[in-house]
Amino acid sequence: MKPGIHPSYGPVVFRDKAADFAFLTRSTMTSDRTVAWEDGNTYPVVDVEISSASHPFYTGTARVLDTAGRVERFERRYGRGGAR
């Protein structure tokens, strides 16, 4: 690798504020704020709005939209448009 052109890559704590969940991983992201982790070391912390701990798809609270009903309602309202 060429020296001096790659960003620094190190441990970072990502904290999901919505789910009160945090995980330690490696990233190129940086932050001025730090947090003491479970292992006793201090790491930079990045707050995120949503993660797998709070996203509806991963938590099983996702809602399925009734697209078939919407299409039928549209066709009733505006008719089946043909070639004009």
UniProtKB/Swiss-Prot annotation:
Signal peptide: none annotated. GO terms for molecular function: structural constituent of ribosome. Transmembrane segments: none annotated. PROSITE patterns: RIBOSOMAL_L31 (PS01143). GO terms for cellular component: ribonucleoprotein complex; ribosome. GO terms for biological process: translation. Keywords: Ribonucleoprotein, Ribosomal protein. Gene3D superfamilies: Ribosomal protein L31. Part of the 50S ribosomal subunit. HAMAP family: Ribosomal_bL31_2. Belongs to the bacterial ribosomal protein bL31 family. Type B subfamily. This is Large ribosomal subunit protein bL31B.
